[in-house]
Curated annotation (Swiss-Prot):
GO terms for molecular function: carbon dioxide binding; iron ion binding. Pathway: Protein modification; [NiFe] hydrogenase maturation. Involved in the maturation of [NiFe] hydrogenases. Involved in the biosynthesis of the Fe(CN)(2)CO cofactor. The gene is hypC. It comes from the Bacteria. Belongs to the HupF/HypC family. GO terms for biological process: protein maturation. This is Hydrogenase maturation factor HypC. InterPro entries: Hydgase_assmbl_chp_CS, Hydrogenase_HupF/HypC.
């Protein structure tokens, strides 16, 4: 399964290699923008993209980015809850 994480393109770092800097939930990541570049790379500044393994795979709007980030946060919270439930069950069974 391929999971893209929303990131906002904040800088072009190497136009020749089609590299940019994206802000992914407050963390700056180097990303290749070759898959989403349709004109001057500077046109990508401020845009949101789904990023997977260092590549901007598709452009999305800010609302979709917010919805995706919220869903990912919810998924993380669900995983934490399931892990806590498993730990509790193990403790009750004398395994923890």
């Amino acid at each position: 399964m391929c999971l893209g994480i929303p990131g906002q393109i904040v800088a072009i770092t190497d136009a020749g290699r089609m590299m940019a800097l994206a802000d992914v939930s407050g963390v700056k990541r180097a990303v290749n923008v070759a898959c989403v570049a349709e004109g001057p790379l500077e046109d990508l500044l401020g845009h949101w993209a789904l990023i997977h393994v260092g590549f901007a795979m598709s452009l999305i709007d800010e609302a979709e980015a917010a919805r995706t980030l919220e869903a990912l946060r919810d998924l993380g919270e669900a995983q934490e809850t399931l892990a806590q439930m498993a730990e509790g069950a193990a403790a009750l069974e004398g395994r923890g």
